[in-house]
Curated annotation (Swiss-Prot):
Species per Swiss-Prot/TrEMBL record: Saccharolobus islandicus (strain L.S.2.15 / Lassen #1) (Sulfolobus islandicus)
One term of GO molecular function: ribosome binding
Entry keyword Protein biosynthesis: yes
One GO cellular component term noted in the UniProt record for this chain: cytoplasm
Residues carrying Hypusine: 36
Family: Belongs to the eIF-5A family.
InterPro entries, sorted: IF5A-like, IF5A-like_N, NA-bd_OB-fold, Rib_uL2_dom2, Trans_elong_IF5A_hypusine_site, Transl_elong_IF5A_arc, Transl_elong_IF5A_C, Translation_prot_SH3-like_sf
Biological process, per Gene Ontology: positive regulation of translational elongation; positive regulation of translational termination
Identification of the protein by name: Translation initiation factor 5A
Function noted in UniProt: Functions by promoting the formation of the first peptide bond.
Amino acid sequence: MSITYTTVGELKVGSYVVIDGEPCRVVEVTKAKTGKHGSAKANVVAIGVFSGAKKTLMAPVDQQVEVPIIEKHIGQIIADMDDKIQVMDLETYETFEIEKPTEDELASKIRPNAELEYWEIMGRRKIVRVK
């Protein structure tokens, strides 16, 4: 798995974090003041990149969390199968299958020979944009 580490206090809206083993995009960060006993706490609300599920993380601001490394690639659609798409990476010429996106905006643009941008996060791939 390709991950790095950072503290909860350094997370910003729009950054990525691993919660419950799934990479998530941070949509809200709130920090509570330090109390008489203990350290400041942060409440992080994030949405899963692959599942779209809302996840929360409540932790001290100095706690270490995993941050996924996102590798961005360009590929070309070779074949459109029922629920998957066969894609060839335009840098390495590797051929693989990737799940068809559920968003209507992306699904309507999928056709053979179209170029697309996909992200590889923690060994999984997701189509982000179809050109």
